[in-house]
Curated annotation (Swiss-Prot):
GO terms for molecular function: G protein activity; GTP binding; GTPase activity. Residues 166-185 are annotated as: Hypervariable region. Belongs to the small GTPase superfamily. Ras family. Disulfide bonds: none annotated. The lineage of its organism: Eukaryota, Metazoa, Chordata, Craniata, Vertebrata. This is GTPase NRas. It is found in: Cell membrane; Golgi apparatus membrane. It is a lipid-anchor. GO terms for cellular component: Golgi membrane; plasma membrane. It comes from Pongo abelii (Sumatran orangutan). There is a cross-link at residue 170 (Glycyl lysine isopeptide (Lys-Gly) (interchain with G-Cter in ubiquitin)). Residues 187-189 form a propeptide. Palmitoylated by the ZDHHC9-GOLGA7 complex. Depalmitoylated by ABHD17A, ABHD17B and ABHD17C. A continuous cycle of de- and re-palmitoylation regulates rapid exchange between plasma membrane and Golgi. Acetylation at Lys-104 prevents interaction with guanine nucleotide exchange factors (GEFs).
Length: 189
């Protein structure tokens, strides 16, 4: 069974834990209890493949920012979550993305931009803005509601698909037959 290490990042109060718990336990947590770090595991079937999701739900509060490098380093893919009723959380996405690129030392990291709380009538982040940001990053954008479950599976499953594409790209680039160990051609005897 293939395992995928997913990390959920975003500002405090955007619903990272609510999204994760909705996926794992199928219920909505409506009280806000700031997370330091929680880990969840769930076996799911995505596109006919049984896989194990190892999800790290992270702290959004600034006082825990020193921990971010470590969990960004270990994650294969990241859900970058903002709340559609919180413009600051949307602006913060760029800071998270820059930190991810720095920690991973790469511009090519599997990510999905997630606009949470789409069930709320008080929107301050326009869907078009979010689509444009995701397009500029070259990543998918999905609106979700942890409360109604809208888009929750889609967000996590899309991230798994992004990781699969990334793995295949890495595999194909290292398996083109021209480069072997340390950049030298291989000879099988």
């Amino acid at each position: 069974m293939t395992e995928y290490k997913l990390v959920v990042v975003g500002a405090g109060g955007v619903g990272k834990s609510a999204l994760t718990i909705q996926l794992i336990q199928n219920h909505f947590v409506d009280e806000y209890d700031p997370t330091i770090e929680d880990s969840y595991r769930k076996q799911v079937v995505i596109d006919g493949e049984t896989c194990l999701l190892d999800i790290l739900d992270t702290a959004g509060q600034e006082e825990y920012s020193a921990m971010r490098d470590q969990y960004m380093r270990t994650g294969e893919g990241l859900l970058c979550v903002f709340a559609i009723n919180n413009s600051k959380s949307f602006a913060d996405i760029n800071l998270y993305r820059e930190q991810i690129k720095r920690v991973k030392d790469s511009d090519d990291v599997p990510m999905v931009l997630v606009g949470n709380k789409c069930d709320l009538p008080t929107r301050t982040v326009d869907t078009k803005q979010a689509h444009e940001l995701a397009k500029s990053y070259g990543i998918p954008f999905i609106e979700t509601s942890a409360k109604t479950r809208q888009g929750v599976e889609d967000a996590f499953y899309t991230l798994v698909r992004e990781i699969r594409q990334y793995r295949m790209k890495k595999l194909n680039s290292s398996d083109d037959g021209t480069q072997g160990c340390m950049g030298l051609p291989c000879v099988v005897m």
